[in-house]
């Protein structure tokens, strides 16, 4: 049977969890509003316009800051020569020369192409991470971590559904 002390602690824990959850959701909504309205990005579209050009999975990741399930993208195991472009606006983002197998189940790179991506602070999921987005359309790509290989020590952990692989033309 639940005594008064246990009930009090359970109530406090529930209230604290709800408070943190709504704070994170509010921060995420503000970030989403920045990428879909009053946008500093070269390419801006309404959510309806994005839905017409993206698959539901691409819309979820690129426009709603979602994450695809690990191991579901064929791009995780793609190592052919070429570039990985933004699935939203086709801006070249990463070269296959910087791709490596991180063992995470997501395509990973140690360095983006020059002037391709931008970063913001992501405080969702009870932690602080560095979110990576396309600098041209603002599409959410993934996150960058400081546990990658030389020469940068960085791991750009990208959602494969947010990328489009363009094979290098045969010479």
Mark where each language-model region is.
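N-terminal post-signal-peptidase region of extra-cytosolic proteins
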Residues: 62-79
